[in-house]
């Protein structure tokens, strides 16, 4: 089954993330994604982010940019990615890190989101780079 993505409109961003993550989105998930992105890429210096909804139930964010980013990760990956691939990578890292928390409902949501996003990333044009960065 092919997993597709659809941009979440400006009008629905807040309600969409609140429905999925509650207050954890603006307080924990969103800052984690931004911080991880800054740590992974010296080329990244802030951006407007698009929110994406996946046909399998997953969600992710990516910087709105046509630029490519040099990326290096703690697993010794070093390479170049599009903004979309960078966003997927940062969200996979964030979902993984946050899945070890104490609030069961939020951690379960992060676990499920990780798996849905990973499934989408398997067919991404930059799947090789994404998975070298994550694993």
Please place each PLM-identified region on the residue numbering.
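Low-complexity intrinsically disordered segments
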Residues: 2-13, 22, 99-135
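Short, charged/polar micro-motifs that form catalytic or ligand-binding hotspots
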Residues: 7, 37-41, 74-81
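A structural signal for well-ordered alpha-helical scaffolds and beta->alpha junctions
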Residues: 10, 30-33, 85, 110
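Extreme N-terminus nucleophile/cap motif
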Residues: 14-28
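Hydrophobic, Leu/Ile/Phe/Ala-enriched alpha-helical segments that form helix-helix packing faces
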Residues: 21, 37-41, 92, 99, ...
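Amphipathic, interaction-prone secondary-structure segments
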Residues: 25-68
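Compact, glycine/acidic-enriched structural inserts
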Residues: 72-109
